[in-house]
């Protein structure tokens, strides 16, 4: 019985999971020798971008970007149509998947879960149809899932302004394609028109449906989270040597036409901006957004952490100091750092996860401790107070939908109700997501005179747009220059 967002069905041994991960790695080209670059050169964003440009397979990138054309059919919609011709009742499971996706944060982990569950649903329900080799045979790419479930949201309610919706999707695609192909500029998208967009009150929740989801699931994806980003710069301060070796061995043993993968970048094509970079102790993949999508326990801890920072004291401390003091207090209270000391490999600590602290306010175990250790004070500060994508994810997620189900005897009725009510509501407006996507692209682009002018023009309107939609955030001018 399909329940959605079920970690028991998607373990790190899952062939579907590992197949998706494999095809979300980029294939490197042989490195190009350079007399000006040495092994001891200081690492900065300009050097990293330059190195990436010379190492990635441009032919593969061009092939992947085919899915980012507005006049190309949606391959996921085509598969859905094929499945419905075989068995119309299949749409009920698909509707539950879409409903859960609707309240999921836009993170690589969320996209991996949605993609894996979709493939699992079609393979298990239609064994007479050959759905093997979807990625290997270029039937789909991960960008088909990006567009279908998180950008255009093909399953969602019909909007009145079809052309504006089409143009927003077109702009999203252009942003991804320009960053994927490492172009020198970002598409010039004017967001000022969204400031005059009429703000009509709209429904953002389905309380009648949501109240049916009352049974907590024992779902938790933190092990998968460590697995997918082990051996990458996302975990550059917390090594997982054995876990990384296991992952690389597993995905390389899959039958595939990929002969080599860019290991340190990880499955970066799962990210909203498919570009692996670090800057000022932040990475282009936010682990705290990933953690939100992992379980209700982890979501509630992050909610407690944020409230503790806000309530820390009545004095006018800077937010970064509040973050540092609160995390130090939590570590001192939980004592997990006493058991999980400096190790050369934390893989065993992940699988054992034997140390945990819980009280009336929060639960913290080895998994969360290691993620906080990796993100550090700056990463927590950026997530809660600086990054508009993180804040949009916080607004979007509904843990009661993602991590709950209903009684076994009622779940089919729930799926039917979801299907016929067709309420896939957008919490954050589609044009706001576009503006945030553009902001994230500006964070990683190589600076030049043209880009600086474009960024300055964009930020003026972006700041006003965030205020209009009640995004209480540190000045984006700071964030766009200092973090990724």
UniProtKB/Swiss-Prot annotation:
What InterPro entries would the database entry show?
A: Herpes_env
| Pfam families the UniProt entry points to | Herpes_env
Recorded GO molecular functions are: zinc ion binding
Per the UniProt record, the source organism is Human herpesvirus 6B (strain Z29)
Q: Which residues form a coiled coil?
A: none
Task: Map out region (Zinc finger 1) in residue numbers.
Answer: 74-154
Function of this protein? Plays a role in efficient localization of neo-synthesized capsids to nuclear replication compartments, thereby controlling cleavage and packaging of virus genomic DNA.
Q: What is this protein called?
A: Packaging protein UL32 homolog
| Region entry Zinc finger 2, spans | 286-390
UniProt-annotated binding residues for Zn(2+) 1: 74, 77, 148, 154
Q: Which residues bind Zn(2+) 2?
A: 286, 289, 383, 390
- List keywords of the entry alphabetically: Host cytoplasm, Host nucleus, Metal-binding, Zinc, Zinc-finger
Q: Which family does it belong to?
A: Belongs to the herpesviridae UL32 protein family.
- Cell location: Host cytoplasm; Host nucleus
Q: Per the record, GO CC terms?
A: host cell cytoplasm; host cell nucleus; viral envelope
Query: Does this UniProt record's set of keywords contain Cell cycle?
Result: no
């Amino acid at each position: 019985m399909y329940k959605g967002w079920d970690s028991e069905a998607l373990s790190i041994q899952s062939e579907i999971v590992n197949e998706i991960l494999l095809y979300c790695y980029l294939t490197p080209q042989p490195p190009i020798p350079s007399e000006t670059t040495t092994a001891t050169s200081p690492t900065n964003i300009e050097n990293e971008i330059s190195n990436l440009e010379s190492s990635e397979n441009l032919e593969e990138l061009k092939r992947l970007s085919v899915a980012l054309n507005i006049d190309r059919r949606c391959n996921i919609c085509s598969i859905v149509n094929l499945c419905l011709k075989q068995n119309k009742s299949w749409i009920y499971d698909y509707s539950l998947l879409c409903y859960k996706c609707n309240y999921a944060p836009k993170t690589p982990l969320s996209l991996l879960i949605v993609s894996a569950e979709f493939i699992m649903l079609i393979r298990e329900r239609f064994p007479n149809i050959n759905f093997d080799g979807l990625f290997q045979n270029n039937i789909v790419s991960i960008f088909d899932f990006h567009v279908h479930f998180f950008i255009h949201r093909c399953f969602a309610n019909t909007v009145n302004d079809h052309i504006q919706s089409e143009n927003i999707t077109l702009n999203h695609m252009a942003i991804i394609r320009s960053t994927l192909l490492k172009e020198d500029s970002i598409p010039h998208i004017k967001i000022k028109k969204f400031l005059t967009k009429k703000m009509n009150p709209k429904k953002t929740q389905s309380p009648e449906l949501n109240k049916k989801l009352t049974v907590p699931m024992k779902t938790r994806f933190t092990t998968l989270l460590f697995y997918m980003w082990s051996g990458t710069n996302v975990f550059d301060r917390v090594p997982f040597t054995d876990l990384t070796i296991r992952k690389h061995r597993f995905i390389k043993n899959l039958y595939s036409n990929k002969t080599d993968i860019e290991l340190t970048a990880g499955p970066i094509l799962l990210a909203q901006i498919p570009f692996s970079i670090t800057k000022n102790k932040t990475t282009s993949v936010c682990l705290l957004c990933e953690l939100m999508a992992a379980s209700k326990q982890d979501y509630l801890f992050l909610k407690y952490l944020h409230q503790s920072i806000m309530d820390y004291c009545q004095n006018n401390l800077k937010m970064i100091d509040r973050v540092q003091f609160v995390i130090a207090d939590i570590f001192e209270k939980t004592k997990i750092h006493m058991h999980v000391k400096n190790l050369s490999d934390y893989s065993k600590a992940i699988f054992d996860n034997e140390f945990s602290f819980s009280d009336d306010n929060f639960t913290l175990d080895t998994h969360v401790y290691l993620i906080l250790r990796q993100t550090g004070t700056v990463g927590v500060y950026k997530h809660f107070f600086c990054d508009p994508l993180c804040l949009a994810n916080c607004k979007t997620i509904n843990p009661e939908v993602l991590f709950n189900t209903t009684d076994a005897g009622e779940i089919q009725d729930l799926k039917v109700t979801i299907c016929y009510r067709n309420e896939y509501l957008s919490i954050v407006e589609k044009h706001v997501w576009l503006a945030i996507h553009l902001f994230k692209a500006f964070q990683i682009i190589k600076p030049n005179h043209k880009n600086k002018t474009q960024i300055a023009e964009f930020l003026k309107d972006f700041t006003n747009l965030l205020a209009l939609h009640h995004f209480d955030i540190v000045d984006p001018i700071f964030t766009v220059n200092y973090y990724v």
